[in-house]
Swiss-Prot record:
It comes from Arabidopsis thaliana (Mouse-ear cress). It comes from the Eukaryota. GO terms for molecular function: cyclin-dependent protein serine/threonine kinase regulator activity. SUPFAM superfamilies: Cyclin-like (SSF47954). Residues 21-32, 76-85 have a biased composition (Polar residues). Residues 1-98 are annotated as: Disordered. This is Putative cyclin-B3-1.
Length: 396
């Protein structure tokens, strides 16, 4: 009986101890749950002396976390926390809700590169109107920038040909001018396209810059260049017998075909060149030109074809300068616009020397010996632009 009573008392003690532990554990859980913020609210807590590895792991979490490092007073915070280290930092970690759209790294770089608008340092580019008609499929507005990027690149890679005749013993700038003046007349008689004329001059000069020739071959090379250009650019090309006839039977069919093969081989079949014509088309659109401005600009650039001096300038600069001189001659204001500056890549100061040269050609056109271009543009179909009085000098 005594043993049974001792066993029962021991069991009662164990039951009481077990119930006490359960009660204490429950109270501790309730106390810790009171410290937790309600679900759905953003939680903020201060963490003292977090190692850099922990911060890196926190930033790599999927949720966006904004971390701010605050320097605390060494006496205030360290005394309360018991930390005596004066370099103690407190990190305020605030959890933010996920954004629907993540920002790309490029957008962050762009935003970081902007100047402060409050300091007035922003340099936002001027919004210029488009010069392309996207509704017109023939203008290939989707590809026009890529096309002209090719022309700009090709022009930069091709050196200027302003001194190539110094290597020729029998060909002079005067001889070249006479040949080109005659080719302009032949081109006009055959009623070929503008593109054909400018490509003819490009093929002629490129070939002469690479191959030494005799004086009696000049006309043969000119006619062959015209034949190649018309095959590449025009709807039709002159027959070889017509070219022989217009040269007063100076050459045979075999000679023309042989020169055609020689030119193609020497030029490596590269016929798509950045001629002044392709730049003129684009720049006139940027100038929002009327017919008179267009005809005068083409008249001035065609005067440059005959002059060997003009070869020292790039085709794009020649076209931009021709439009500038034409606008000044017609007293248009402003003489140069932001749209022209954007599409030509030239400002007025960069065109000064070239513009002065073109104005000199304009003054001499009426009384010069090579008058085919002057007589061509004195026609009413070309707005009689050749009769316009040249300026005494260009505005500063």
């Amino acid at each position: 009986m005594l043993r049974d009573g001792n066993k029962q008392s021991k069991n009662n003690v164990r039951f009481v101890r077990k119930s006490i532990k359960t009660t204490v554990k429950t109270s501790l859980q309730n106390r810790s749950s009171l410290k937790k913020p309600p679900v759905g609210r953003s939680k903020s807590r201060s963490i003292s002396s977090i190692p850099s590895s922990a911060v890196a792991s926190t930033l790599s979490l999927p949720e966006k976390v904004e971390t701010k490092c605050l320097e605390e007073d060494t006496q205030g915070e360290s005394s309360s926390s018991g930390n005596k280290d004066p370099t103690t930092k407190v990190l305020d970690v605030t959890a933010k809700p996920k954004s629907k759209r993540r920002k790309s790294f490029t957008s962050l770089l762009v935003n970081g590169s902007k100047f402060d608008e409050k300091n007035g340092e922003t340099t936002e580019p001027e919004k210029l109107p488009s010069i392309d008609d996207e509704s017109n499929q023939l203008e290939v507005a989707e590809y026009v920038d890529d096309i002209y990027q090719f022309y700009w690149t090709a022009e930069a890679l091709n050196p200027a040909l302003g001194h190539y005749l110094s290597a020729h013993a029998e060909v002079s700038p005067v001889t070249r001018g006479i040949l080109i003046n005659w080719l302009i007349e032949v081109h006009f008689k055959f009623d070929l396209m503008h593109e054909t004329l400018y490509l003819t001059m490009d093929l002629l000069d490129r070939y002469l810059s690479q191959v030494p020739i005799h004086k009696n071959e000049m006309q043969l090379i000119g006619l062959t260049a015209l034949l190649l250009a018309s095959k590449y650019e025009d709807y039709w090309h002159p027959r070889i017998k017509d070219l022989i006839s217009i040269s007063a039977e100076s050459y045979t069919r075999e000679q023309i075909l042989g020169m055609e093969r020689s030119m193609l081989k020497q030029l490596k079949f590269r016929l798509n060149a950045p001629t002044p014509y392709v730049f003129m088309l684009r720049f006139l659109k940027a100038a929002q030109s009327n017919k008179k401005l267009e005809q005068l600009a083409f008249y001035l650039i065609e005067l440059c074809l005959v002059e060997y001096e003009a070869l020292k300038y790039k085709p794009s600069l020649l076209c931009a300068s021709a439009i500038y001189v034409a606008r000044c001659t017609l007293h248009m204001t402003p003489v140069w616009t932001s749209l022209l500056n954007n599409h030509t890549h030239y400002n007025v100061s960069q065109m000064k020397d070239c513009s002065d040269m073109i104005l000199r050609f304009h003054k001499a056109a009426k009384t010069g010996n090579l008058r085919v271009t002057y007589e061509k543009y004195i026609n009413p179909d070309r707005s009689n632009v050749a009769v316009l009085k040249p300026l005494d000098k260009l505005p500063l």
